[in-house]
């Protein structure tokens, strides 16, 4: 059995799940990030499954999502990459808040996510060596190139607009896989993707798999590609994530 609560950590609304009676017991912990236009509540099945596996789970609402949503859907659709960047930047304070609660067992902290959350998890892993392992479900590690086709912040038609686009996207380069293959390959990493994904192309994670393989950094890599699956989490994907964290965290 598990328990689950809504609360704030570092002023960020989160879902907090854990095995029953172990709220204040140090446990291995997974921070799991949800997808775009969704919320931690919608993705709470991950919290349930991982807590049932004996883990502590923290699921933050992304900026302008869940209880942080401003109500302006049109504005949010143009803020995908800014939201991704802020979510990655918030990891440091979120991790510190978890540690301050004395919730971590032997610093065993992992990250995972789906879609935008999978990108968040990969970016955090690229910059934070304290992350023990990572699960990326239907995501990408190549932000600056994908931003031209997936929820672009604007469609540049003038030189000024191109400069504005570049200024929005440029900070993402510090977080993407291109410059951090060593960091992404030096600890266990799960990549899962539906091969018929109609939102985030499966080629995004296949590209990362190839880059890690070609540089000899795939020794700790687990890949799972599911034929016939579009942009959704399947029962098999959930099982793969739970099995992965059980084994590596």
Task: State where each predicted segment sits.
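N-terminal cap/lid segment of alpha/beta-hydrolase-fold proteins
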Residues: 1-25
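Short beta-strand element of the alpha/beta-hydrolase
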Residues: 25-35
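The serine-hydrolase catalytic nucleophile loop
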Residues: 36-48
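Conserved alpha/beta-hydrolase
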Residues: 49-73
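Alpha/beta-hydrolase active-site loop
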Residues: 78-102
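Primarily recognizes the serine-hydrolase "nucleophile elbow" in alpha/beta-hydrolase
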Residues: 94-152
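The feature captures the conserved acid-bearing segment of alpha/beta-hydrolase catalytic domains
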Residues: 145-206
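C-terminal catalytic histidine-bearing segment of alpha/beta-hydrolase fold enzymes
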Residues: 206, 214-249
């Amino acid at each position: 059995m598990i328990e689950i609560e809504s609360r704030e950590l570092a002023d960020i609304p989160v879902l907090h799940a854990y095995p029953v009676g172990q709220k204040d017991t140090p446990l291995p912990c997974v921070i799991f990030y949800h997808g775009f236009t969704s919320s931690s509540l919608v993705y709470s099945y991950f919290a349930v499954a991982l807590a049932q596996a004996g883990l502590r789970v923290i699921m933050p609402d992304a900026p302008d999502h869940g209880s942080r949503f401003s109500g302006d859907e049109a504005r949010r659709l143009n803020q995908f990459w800014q939201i991704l960047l802020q979510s990655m930047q918030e990891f440091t304070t979120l991790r510190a808040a978890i540690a301050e609660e004395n919730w971590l067992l032997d610093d065993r902290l992992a990250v995972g996510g789906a879609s935008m959350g999978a990108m968040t998890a990969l970016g955090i892993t690229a910059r934070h060596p304290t992350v023990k392992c990572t699960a990326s479900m239907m995501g990408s590690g190549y932000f600056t190139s994908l931003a031209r086709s997936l929820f672009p912040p604007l469609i540049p038609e003038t030189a000024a607009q191109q400069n504005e686009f570049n200024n929005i996207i440029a900070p993402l380069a510090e977080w993407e896989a291109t410059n951090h293959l060593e960091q992404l390959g030096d600890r266990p990493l799960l990549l899962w993707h539906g091969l018929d994904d109609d939102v985030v192309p499966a080629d995004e994670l296949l590209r990362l798999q190839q880059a890690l393989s070609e540089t000899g950094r795939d020794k700790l890599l687990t890949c799972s590609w599911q034929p016939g699956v579009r942009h959704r989490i399947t029962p098999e994907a959930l099982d793969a994530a739970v099995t992965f964290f059980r084994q590596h965290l």
